[in-house]
Amino acid sequence: VSPPGGSRPLFHHCCLFALAAPPDAALLAELERFSAAFRAAFPAIRRYRFGANLSRKAGRFGLVLYSAFDDEASFRAYVASALHDEVAAFLAPLVTETMIGDIEA
């Protein structure tokens, strides 16, 4: 599938997190702080957003991370970063299960 107008496809990364407790305003605010730091540190990030899962089929997966990168190499650099390690360590005690999907579109 090609993007509209023949532009280059982006690399999209989506994480669904099951949490021990539903995401509250304090958690979402802290995750927005991380989001802003990622956007500032990585110019190849086109979108980066945590949010409560609004799907009626969310089930136990109450938190979503949606991100889009210029390409897969940019995504790999993000995953290898100390900032990624920091957010992963922050979320680790809160998360009971994670599902991840990546596509280029």
PLM segments and residue spans:
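Short S/T/G/P-rich N-terminal loop/turn motif that feeds into the first structured element of a domain
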Residues: V1-G62, D70-A80, T96, I103-A105
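Short, flexible helix/strand-to-coil boundary loops that buttress conserved ligand/catalytic motifs
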Residues: V79, A88-L91
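Short glycine/proline-enriched turn or capping motifs at secondary-structure junctions
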Residues: L91-T98
